[in-house]
A protein has these predicted regions:
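HAD-like aspartate-dependent phosphatase fold
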Residues: 2-207
């Protein structure tokens, strides 16, 4: 069977065929700095037609944090009824201690709200049960070689990647995401569990 891709000019061409929509945020609805006016018009149209939609994001943070972020971008809160993030999907699993209790947080301080309430379980690479990867530490640590050296002795640990994206475009700038670190870890022989698009867990949680 040969599957043919049908190109469309806009969602309005197919929206009558579906009851619900999964809509990505970064790069679709906004660019990290501002909302895309055309995308907001689409959301207004879907809302007026009483179509259900979930705004999904590979942000390694709880859904509520992204809701606040979108409000700061001046998004109408009527569109924020269903926001779900890869961080939220990971959090729901981490609460059950599926991968152990003690973790090493590999990521920047801005993602600390993901581990709110779990701070006591944060520990060193030497003592942790698994690595919780939300991204690079801070802007000055932009070389993947730095992280390869850091993780070289710990490939027997499991890494939980809360953002499978390799890079993100913030305005006109490109930045590494947690997915780049996870890919490097896998190439070194480590095992990674991914939460976020395109992996099924985030969609299963939304449903």
């Amino acid at each position: 069977i040969i599957m043919r891709t049908k190109l469309i000019k806009g969602l309005s061409q197919i929206q009558s065929k579906y009851d619900a929509f999964f809509i990505d945020l970064w790069g679709v609805v906004h660019n990290g700095i501002q909302l895309y006016p055309g995308a907001i018009e689409v959301l207004k149209n879907l809302n007026n037609l009483n179509k259900r939609f979930v705004l999904i994001s590979n942000a390694p943070r709880p859904s509520k944090s992204v809701e606040k972020y979108l409000l700061n971008l001046k998004m109408d809160k009527v569109f924020l009824k269903n926001v779900f993030t890869s961080g939220e999907a990971a959090l729901q699993t981490l609460k059950k201690n599926v991968y152990g209790k003690k973790f090493y947080h590999l990521g920047p301080q801005k993602d600390k709200d993901l581990i709110e309430g779990f701070e006591k379980n944060k520990t060193s690479l030497e003592k942790c049960d698994f690595i919780l990867c939300t991204g690079l530490f801070e802007n000055e640590e932009i070389s993947l070689d730095y992280y390869k050296k850091l993780l070289k002795k710990y490939t027997k640990l499991k890494m939980i990647c809360t953002n499978p994206d390799l890079i993100v475009h913030r305005g006109s700038q490109s930045e590494y995401c947690a997915g780049s670190l996870a890919l490097a870890f896998e190439k070194m022989g480590g095992k990674v569990v991914y939460f976020g698009k395109p992996y099924p867990e985030i969609y299963n949680f939304c449903i």
